[in-house]
Protein backbone atom coordinates (compact mmCIF):
# COMPACT_ATOMS: atom_id res chain seq x y z
CA UNK A 1 0.00 0.00 0.00
CA UNK A 2 1.08 3.54 -0.70
CA UNK A 3 0.41 6.64 1.39
CA UNK A 4 -0.60 9.84 -0.40
CA UNK A 5 -1.23 12.91 1.76
CA UNK A 6 -4.40 14.67 0.62
CA UNK A 7 -2.92 18.16 0.74
CA UNK A 8 -6.14 19.97 -0.21
CA UNK A 9 -8.38 17.92 2.10
CA UNK A 10 -9.61 19.89 5.12
CA UNK A 11 -11.15 17.89 7.95
CA UNK A 12 -11.30 20.65 10.56
CA UNK A 13 -9.84 18.18 13.05
CA UNK A 14 -6.67 18.74 15.06
CA UNK A 15 -5.43 15.20 14.48
CA UNK A 16 -4.59 13.14 11.41
CA UNK A 17 -6.72 10.38 9.93
CA UNK A 18 -5.44 7.63 7.69
CA UNK A 19 -7.71 5.34 5.66
CA UNK A 20 -7.79 3.76 2.21
CA UNK A 21 -9.99 6.51 0.74
CA UNK A 22 -10.68 6.76 -2.97
CA UNK A 23 -8.84 9.99 -3.89
CA UNK A 24 -9.48 12.53 -6.62
CA UNK A 25 -7.35 11.96 -9.71
CA UNK A 26 -4.90 14.59 -8.48
CA UNK A 27 -4.70 12.75 -5.11
CA UNK A 28 -4.92 16.14 -3.42
CA UNK A 29 -8.30 15.43 -1.78
CA UNK A 30 -10.79 12.68 -1.01
CA UNK A 31 -13.32 11.98 -3.74
CA UNK A 32 -17.03 12.47 -3.03
CA UNK A 33 -18.11 8.89 -3.65
CA UNK A 34 -20.25 6.29 -1.90
CA UNK A 35 -17.17 4.07 -1.59
CA UNK A 36 -15.68 6.51 0.95
CA UNK A 37 -18.78 6.85 3.17
CA UNK A 38 -18.25 3.66 5.24
CA UNK A 39 -14.71 4.76 6.01
CA UNK A 40 -15.93 7.87 7.82
CA UNK A 41 -18.19 5.85 10.15
CA UNK A 42 -15.39 3.32 10.69
CA UNK A 43 -13.01 6.17 11.56
CA UNK A 44 -15.59 7.49 14.04
CA UNK A 45 -15.72 4.09 15.77
CA UNK A 46 -11.93 3.79 15.71
CA UNK A 47 -11.56 7.26 17.22
CA UNK A 48 -13.86 6.34 20.12
CA UNK A 49 -12.03 3.03 20.68
CA UNK A 50 -8.77 4.99 20.68
CA UNK A 51 -10.11 7.29 23.41
CA UNK A 52 -10.45 4.25 25.70
CA UNK A 53 -6.84 3.27 25.01
CA UNK A 54 -5.65 6.86 25.48
CA UNK A 55 -7.47 6.94 28.84
CA UNK A 56 -5.99 3.59 29.89
CA UNK A 57 -2.50 4.92 29.11
CA UNK A 58 -3.15 7.89 31.41
CA UNK A 59 -3.09 10.38 28.54
CA UNK A 60 -6.78 11.39 28.43
CA UNK A 61 -6.33 14.52 30.54
CA UNK A 62 -7.91 17.94 30.58
CA UNK A 63 -5.14 19.18 28.30
CA UNK A 64 -5.81 16.38 25.80
CA UNK A 65 -9.39 17.63 25.36
CA UNK A 66 -8.04 20.61 23.38
CA UNK A 67 -7.21 18.20 20.53
CA UNK A 68 -10.80 16.98 20.21
CA UNK A 69 -13.33 18.75 17.95
CA UNK A 70 -15.59 21.27 19.67
CA UNK A 71 -18.92 22.78 18.58
CA UNK A 72 -17.24 25.93 17.24
CA UNK A 73 -14.88 24.07 14.91
CA UNK A 74 -15.63 24.28 11.19
CA UNK A 75 -15.93 20.58 10.44
CA UNK A 76 -17.13 19.56 6.97
CA UNK A 77 -20.31 17.42 6.93
CA UNK A 78 -18.58 14.16 6.07
CA UNK A 79 -16.37 14.49 9.17
CA UNK A 80 -19.29 15.33 11.49
CA UNK A 81 -19.82 11.63 12.32
CA UNK A 82 -16.41 11.63 14.02
CA UNK A 83 -17.27 14.68 16.13
CA UNK A 84 -20.69 13.25 17.01
CA UNK A 85 -19.23 9.86 18.02
CA UNK A 86 -16.64 11.52 20.27
CA UNK A 87 -19.24 13.67 22.05
CA UNK A 88 -21.62 10.73 22.47
CA UNK A 89 -18.87 8.54 23.92
CA UNK A 90 -17.65 11.26 26.29
CA UNK A 91 -21.24 11.84 27.49
CA UNK A 92 -22.12 8.16 28.00
CA UNK A 93 -18.88 6.32 28.78
CA UNK A 94 -16.28 6.88 31.54
CA UNK A 95 -14.02 9.00 29.33
CA UNK A 96 -14.44 12.57 30.59
CA UNK A 97 -11.60 13.63 32.91
CA UNK A 98 -12.72 14.59 36.40
CA UNK A 99 -11.44 17.04 38.99
CA UNK A 100 -10.35 14.04 41.09
CA UNK A 101 -8.12 12.70 38.25
CA UNK A 102 -10.45 9.85 37.28
CA UNK A 103 -12.92 9.53 34.38
CA UNK A 104 -16.71 9.45 34.23
CA UNK A 105 -19.50 9.95 31.71
CA UNK A 106 -20.00 13.70 31.18
CA UNK A 107 -23.75 13.30 31.86
CA UNK A 108 -22.87 12.30 35.40
CA UNK A 109 -20.58 15.26 36.10
CA UNK A 110 -21.04 18.81 37.29
CA UNK A 111 -18.96 21.87 36.41
CA UNK A 112 -18.23 24.64 38.89
CA UNK A 113 -15.54 27.14 39.77
CA UNK A 114 -12.40 25.61 41.24
CA UNK A 115 -13.05 27.14 44.67
CA UNK A 116 -16.43 25.39 44.94
CA UNK A 117 -14.94 22.11 43.72
CA UNK A 118 -12.21 22.37 46.36
CA UNK A 119 -14.79 23.13 49.08
CA UNK A 120 -16.85 20.06 48.19
CA UNK A 121 -14.17 17.70 46.98
CA UNK A 122 -14.13 14.72 49.30
CA UNK A 123 -16.13 11.59 48.48
CA UNK A 124 -18.11 12.18 51.70
CA UNK A 125 -19.11 15.67 50.54
CA UNK A 126 -20.30 14.29 47.22
CA UNK A 127 -22.23 11.48 48.98
CA UNK A 128 -23.80 13.95 51.42
CA UNK A 129 -25.04 16.13 48.58
CA UNK A 130 -25.79 13.24 46.26
CA UNK A 131 -29.27 12.48 47.61
CA UNK A 132 -31.81 13.97 45.23
CA UNK A 133 -32.95 13.73 41.64
CA UNK A 134 -31.24 16.60 39.79
CA UNK A 135 -34.12 17.19 37.37
CA UNK A 136 -36.58 17.75 40.22
CA UNK A 137 -34.13 19.81 42.30
CA UNK A 138 -31.48 21.40 40.04
CA UNK A 139 -29.75 23.16 42.95
CA UNK A 140 -28.78 19.80 44.42
CA UNK A 141 -26.25 17.30 43.24
CA UNK A 142 -28.05 14.27 41.93
CA UNK A 143 -28.29 10.60 42.65
CA UNK A 144 -26.52 9.99 39.37
CA UNK A 145 -23.66 12.43 39.99
CA UNK A 146 -20.09 11.15 39.89
CA UNK A 147 -18.55 14.43 40.99
CA UNK A 148 -16.84 17.35 39.29
CA UNK A 149 -15.63 17.56 35.71
CA UNK A 150 -12.10 18.75 35.09
CA UNK A 151 -11.97 22.50 34.58
CA UNK A 152 -10.52 24.23 31.54
CA UNK A 153 -7.16 25.85 32.18
CA UNK A 154 -8.23 28.92 30.18
CA UNK A 155 -11.62 30.37 29.22
CA UNK A 156 -12.54 30.25 25.50
CA UNK A 157 -9.75 27.77 24.79
CA UNK A 158 -10.31 24.66 22.67
CA UNK A 159 -10.40 22.69 25.92
CA UNK A 160 -13.10 24.98 27.36
CA UNK A 161 -15.15 24.87 24.15
CA UNK A 162 -14.97 21.07 24.02
CA UNK A 163 -16.12 20.75 27.65
CA UNK A 164 -18.96 23.20 26.95
CA UNK A 165 -20.16 20.91 24.15
CA UNK A 166 -20.62 17.97 26.53
CA UNK A 167 -23.65 17.22 28.72
CA UNK A 168 -21.92 18.46 31.88
CA UNK A 169 -24.29 20.34 34.19
CA UNK A 170 -23.28 23.72 35.59
CA UNK A 171 -23.39 24.15 39.36
CA UNK A 172 -22.58 27.45 41.07
CA UNK A 173 -22.47 29.25 44.42
CA UNK A 174 -26.18 30.11 44.17
CA UNK A 175 -26.95 26.39 43.80
CA UNK A 176 -24.77 25.72 46.85
CA UNK A 177 -26.57 28.37 48.92
CA UNK A 178 -29.96 26.97 47.90
CA UNK A 179 -28.74 23.54 48.92
CA UNK A 180 -27.63 24.52 52.42
CA UNK A 181 -30.84 26.52 52.93
CA UNK A 182 -33.06 23.65 51.76
CA UNK A 183 -35.21 21.62 54.20
CA UNK A 184 -33.07 18.56 53.46
CA UNK A 185 -30.17 20.18 55.35
CA UNK A 186 -32.24 20.95 58.49
Please give the residue ranges for each predicted region:
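GHKL/Bergerat-fold ATPase module
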Residues: 1-186
Amino acid sequence: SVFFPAEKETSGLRFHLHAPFVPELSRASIKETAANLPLFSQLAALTVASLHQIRDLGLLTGEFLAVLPNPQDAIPPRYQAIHKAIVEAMNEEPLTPTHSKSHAPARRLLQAKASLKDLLSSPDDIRLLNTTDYTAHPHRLSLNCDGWAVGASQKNSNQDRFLSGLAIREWNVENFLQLIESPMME
